[in-house]
From Swiss-Prot:
Name under which the protein is recorded: 3-hydroxyacyl-[acyl-carrier-protein] dehydratase FabZ
Active site, renumbered: H58
Lineage: Bacteria, Pseudomonadati, Pseudomonadota, Alphaproteobacteria, Rhodobacterales
Entry annotated with the keyword Metal-binding: no
Role this protein plays: Involved in unsaturated fatty acids biosynthesis. Catalyzes the dehydration of short chain beta-hydroxyacyl-ACPs and long chain saturated and unsaturated beta-hydroxyacyl-ACPs.
Length: 160
């Protein structure tokens, strides 16, 4: 598998995302990934709607997207970026959180918002197992959340 096997592929729609990530409703938290630059950077898009199950309890009458789901959306964006950038489309790849650092929440994310997840690879190489990412989530250009996170890539879904 080559790190530049898809050099012209700069975006992933929901169909391609589902070929890369094992997540499905209600835990698939990215609708589209654009501006993919190999395995180095990408921008995910999540259209936040009232139909999401977490809004039933977080919080009744005042729906706010849970911060942990924002961080997960950044991680899923990173997974799609790696899947495209390292030619792991249609494989059994799994990515596991190992660490989350410097996580801060700056504004509420509510139904009707378009959440953009901007992710960059800080450390990690094609063929490697451990990757560190920097992520920022924005709504209308305003910072909603930020975090650094480390993940392990399991290319065949057997390393756990």
């Amino acid at each position: 598998m080559s790190a530049d096997a898809n050099p012209d592929l700069k975006s992933a729609d929901i169909g391609l995302i589902q070929q890369i990530l094992p997540h499905r409703y209600p835990f698939l938290l990215v609708d589209k990934v654009v501006d993919i630059d190999g395995y180095q950077s990408a921008r995910g898009i999540k259209n936040v709607t009232m139909n999401e199950p977490h809004f039933q309890g977080h919080f009744p009458g005042t729906p706010i997207m849970p911060g942990v789901t924002i961080v997960e959306a950044m991680a899923q964006t990173s997974g799609v970026m790696l899947g495209v950038g390292m030619d792991l489309i249609g494989t059994d790849m799994l990515i596991y959180f190992m660490n989350i650092d410097k996580c801060k929440f700056r504004r509420k994310v509510v139904p009707g918002d378009v959440l953009e997840m901007h992710v960059e690879t800080v450390r990690g190489k094609p063929g490697g197992k451990i990757f560190k990412f920097s992520g920022r989530a924005t709504v209308d250009g305003e910072l909603a959340a930020e975090a650094e996170f480390t993940a392990m890539i399991d290319r065949d879904g057997k390393d756990g």
